[in-house]
A protein has these predicted regions:
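A hydrophobic, helix-centered structural microdomain
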Residues: 256-321, 361, 433, 438-453
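A short, structured surface patch at a secondary-structure boundary
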Residues: 334-397, 439-447
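C-terminal terminal-structure detector
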Residues: 342, 364, 385-453
């Protein structure tokens, strides 16, 4: 809401400065084209994560995202007003005021966002929070709360029931051993919300102690739900089969799945048709750059564990008939700055242009635009052995992009894929058309930054 106000205030100031006074009739002539432009700007801000509390901090990450968004917004403004014919609707050309509007907006927007981040990060009104119980997820959650004060929680203490207390972890947080005098401890620290780990619920005595605290206006939430809300992933160590029975409903998603299939088909058909113009150029550069076929064919695991074939533009040096590069090394996950990639292949992978042929897989229904990554059978066998509930990723179709790819990127180890499965399960539980659009928009941001591998 604040951004919208700043947009229109900057327009009013620009027109006032330009015409030496505010004229409502002039404002009316500008309102339609600039409103269209501002809608595009807001989408650009969203793509660059400027509405995520995770980066609502005055640091380099936020500044770089803000600068990129403003540059792209400015360039699109120039295209709209100077290149697209008739965009100014004829009567008066708002493009004469565009530069002034952009300058005023940048100053106001930059100041407003930095003030917002400062206020949110330093607000004294935070929820005093305690974690009851101690496990790896509790530690990760504690680190997340400490690192992101703008989320609105102040972690006061952790209470755990272990004989030994490792002070190398979370040295800045008060850690209390044992659950004796639980109510008095929470009241003394003025805790208003307690996050409870699954282990605590195994003790009937502890449950009674927690129950006795309710009358003192202390709210209790389980670690799994709070962890999910803060990190946007599902903690594998805190769930079991019952979690899937309670949270993963296929029946309630039937209308969504039908609409998603229609959306996938038409969007993939349009993009594939448009991209065909570039295929001959891409194919020629691939052939000139290195020996081997233009396309690379590979088997992947799809919905329900069913194998299917994907086709990609070859981006690596080929040493087998399928365009692969693993004849000598065997199956190997892609890694950052992969030495197997050709010079042009690095560009294809950075921009994800190597995946253009996979639009056909979306059209025929093997894939979707959004979903878990389709893994190779060789890696699938290893990962499902080491990662709990790994196969549950295949409850839905794999995607060209996905929540795990957005939040974590590529994973080249079991530990990486453990993290990605947690994001995949979050998506499967919360998937919706709006969520899909959000992921698609954020994928565009990754492509613009050359974030492929």
């Amino acid at each position: 809401m604040g951004d919208v106000v700043i947009l229109y205030v900057s327009l009013i100031l620009a027109l006032t400065a330009r015409y030496r006074g505010f004229d409502f009739s002039v404002f009316q002539k500008h309102i339609i084209p600039f409103s269209i432009l501002y809608t595009v700007w807001l989408i650009i801000f969203y793509i660059h994560n400027l509405y995520d509390l995770d980066i609502a901090k005055n640091n380099i990450e936020f500044s770089s995202a803000l600068i990129r968004a403003l540059i792209i917004g400015g360039l699109i403004s120039v295209v709209f007003f100077y290149i697209v014919p008739g965009f100014a609707f004829g009567s008066i050309t708002p493009k004469t005021n565009l530069l002034l509007n952009i300058i005023i907006f940048i100053v106001l927007f930059y100041g407003w966002r930095y003030l917002f981040n400062f206020v949110v990060g330093s607000l004294k009104i935070k929820i005093n929070t305690a974690i009851i119980g101690y496990n790896p997820q509790a530690i990760e959650l504690a680190e997340e709360l400490i690192k992101n004060p703008q989320l609105g929680y102040k972690l006061k203490l952790i209470i755990k029931n272990h004989e030994e207390i490792d002070r190398t972890e979370l040295p800045e947080i008060k850690i209390i051993q044992g659950f004796k005098n639980l109510r008095e401890t929470l009241q003394q620290e003025k805790v208003s919300m307690a996050i409870v780990t699954p282990e605590v619920y195994k003790s009937q005595e502890l449950i009674q102690n927690l129950f006795d605290c309710i009358r003192y206006k202390i709210d209790f939430v389980n670690l799994s739900d709070f962890y999910e809300n803060i990190t946007k992933k599902i903690p594998l160590a805190a769930i079991n089969q019952v979690w899937f029975l309670e949270n993963i409903s296929q029946k309630n998603k039937q209308a969504y799945e039908t609409f998603k299939r229609i959306f996938d088909f038409f969007l993939a058909s349009i993009l594939l048709t448009l991209s065909l113009l570039f295929w001959p150029i891409i194919a020629l550069i691939i052939k000139l750059g290195s020996k081997g076929p233009v396309f690379y064919r590979q088997t992947r695991i799809g919905q329900g564990g069913k194998p299917f074939r994907v086709v990609k533009f070859r981006s690596m040096y080929a040493n087998d008939q399928n365009g692969g590069c693993e004849k000598l090394t065997g199956p190997k996950m892609a890694e950052e700055n992969d030495p197997r990639a050709t010079n042009f292949g690095k560009f294809l992978r950075k921009t994800r242009s190597d995946e253009l042929p996979q639009l056909w897989s979306i059209i025929i229904g093997d894939m979707s635009f959004v979903g878990p990554r389709a893994e190779r059978p060789e890696f699938h066998q290893e990962l499902k052995t080491h990662i709990p509930f790994y196969q549950e990723r295949y409850l839905i179709k794999p995607g060209l992009s996905g929540w795990a790819q957005i939040k974590y990127g590529y994973g080249s180890s079991v530990a990486d894929n453990f993290e990605k499965v947690q994001y995949d399960l979050y998506y499967i539980k919360n998937r919706s058309f709006i969520f899909d659009l959000s992921i698609i928009l954020k994928t565009i941001n990754i492509i613009l930054k050359g974030g492929g591998r």
